[in-house]
Amino acid sequence: PGSLVGSEMCIRDRMKLAYADRSEYLGDPDRTVIPVEQLTSEDYLDQRRTIIRDEVAIPSAEIRPGNFEDLESTETTHYSIVDQFGNVVSNTYTINFSFGSGIVVPGTGMLLNNEMDDFAAKPGFPNGYGLVQGEANAVSAGSRPLSSMTPTLVFRDGKPWIATGSPGGSRIITAVAQTLLNIMAFDMTLGMATSAPRIHHQWMPDMAMVEPGISPDTVSILEASKHKILRSNSTIGRVNSVQIEDGWFYGYV
């Protein structure tokens, strides 16, 4: 920041995060397992860094100790791949909730899914992700439930250009859409497009979810437009993509 005041502003919320973790994880090492390796890992620090908003202080009530489980997605899995021959894969798969139905097939280690929640079990009422769905997605014999999974291949001039997708339940669609919009409409690089803060709205509930890194100005504009704001403690989706540009392969998570 170039000044003492600027430096203090830069580190204020980092101090809060450090003390939140202190309250949760530190104690007498003779009787407490202290996760030093996890607390100091690059992945964990990157995760915590997304919470920082240098322009405005984060209220302490909104800060929670970090969650190491978040380093590996507990939800849907997505991967995007391009090989040396130009073959491209965008693949998303899921068992829906964390650990699916919570039932393991004896002797196999295989978890059973709970994809039935993707149906409108009761049309007009929310499912596990808060999505309100109608009769078109009602439970019926032989039907496949509606899914938010969005594995995407983008072609330019008839050739593969981008492979992308994300986990995130109902937030997958908006996460992938915003990433592609950033590239195709706003000329962002793949890295910029992926790391740019995202918003999410799914009609019901009538709230705009915003990531921790969203600018206060953006939030103010949304609120002035009568949007109800829901601040997320984590990213909206976890987009990972591969882009082929001028003979180069670019990947970003």
Positions of PLM-derived features:
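Short Gly/Pro-enriched turn/cap motifs at secondary-structure boundaries
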Residues: 68-72, 137-145, 230-234
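Extended C-terminal subregions enriched in glycine
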Residues: 85, 143, 185-234
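Short, well-ordered beta-strand elements
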Residues: 3, 79-81, 88-92, 160-167, ...
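Single conserved hydrophobic/aromatic residue that forms the stacking wall/gate
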Residues: 1-6, 10-11
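Flexible, glycine/threonine-enriched loop-and-boundary segments that flank and lead into catalytic domains
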Residues: 56-85, 93-98, 133-138
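Alpha-helical support elements that line or immediately flank enzyme active sites
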Residues: 3, 166-188
